Amino acid sequence: MKPTTIASLQKCKQDKKRFATITAYDYSFAKLFADEGLNVMLVGDSLGMTVQGHDSTLPVTVADIAYHTASVRRGAPNCLLLADLPFMAYATPEQAFENAATVMRAGANMVKIEGGEWLVETVKMLTERAVPVCGHLGLTPQSVNIFGGYKVQGRGDEAGDQLLSDALALEAAGAQLLVLECVPVELAKRITEALAIPVIGIGAGNVTDGQILVMHDAFGITGGHIPKFAKNFLAETGDIRAAVRQYMAEVESGVYPGEEHSFH
């Protein structure tokens, strides 16, 4: 199978073809996703909650991300593999570069970092040194203590304009992808149309170029609170492989996420 690349997603945006992505943390699920044609995966710091059982992503370490990245890469050798840099792993550009090198050696094609304009120098440093960067704006879970919980971001003109400004700044600095989490559909549309790079949404409506879900949400095995934007595809299909295919089909057709999964 031909490897999926950042250029593959850029072409999807140009062709207005929606694409699905998903989190993965181990060999077996990564192989299953790849076998079904789901070839863009994220080793997210969400593993702190879904795999390790913490109540936030904050305890996750670079070593944790590298371990799971290596496992996923073995299961999906041709996927486009993103890896989160966890909390406090990119407080300075130099620290970001050192930690990015660790997860890239483990098998990542790209690192994802949370934050806006304050990350411009970090994004420049990484991209100039051949480390592709995916930005992450909106609800950034590593900032949960500042936000006071998991809340929709970017409501109101001022907040929306700031997120758009952040997105443009990250793109100008060299970011090649952007994740938008828990923002109003109207703002997600503005940002997606303003950027040349692909935008991946989670809780941002069906107006972004791609979608991502935490795999546990997609299969209905999340403990505790279920996010509004989540959909249990396993409940509808009764089979994990069929659930993956259904998720991909609904994203590509624009059926998912629906109005019931979106914010305004």
From Swiss-Prot:
The gene is panB. This is 3-methyl-2-oxobutanoate hydroxymethyltransferase. Belongs to the PanB family. Homodecamer; pentamer of dimers. Transmembrane segments: none annotated. Catalyzes the reversible reaction in which hydroxymethyl group from 5,10-methylenetetrahydrofolate is transferred onto alpha-ketoisovalerate to form ketopantoate. Binds 1 Mg(2+) ion per subunit. The active site is at E181. It catalyses: 3-methyl-2-oxobutanoate + (6R)-5,10-methylene-5,6,7,8-tetrahydrofolate + H2O = 2-dehydropantoate + (6S)-5,6,7,8-tetrahydrofolate. The keyword Metal-binding applies. One of its GO terms (biological process) is pantothenate biosynthetic process. Its EC number is 2.1.2.11. 3-methyl-2-oxobutanoate binds at D45, S46, D84, K112. The keyword Magnesium applies.
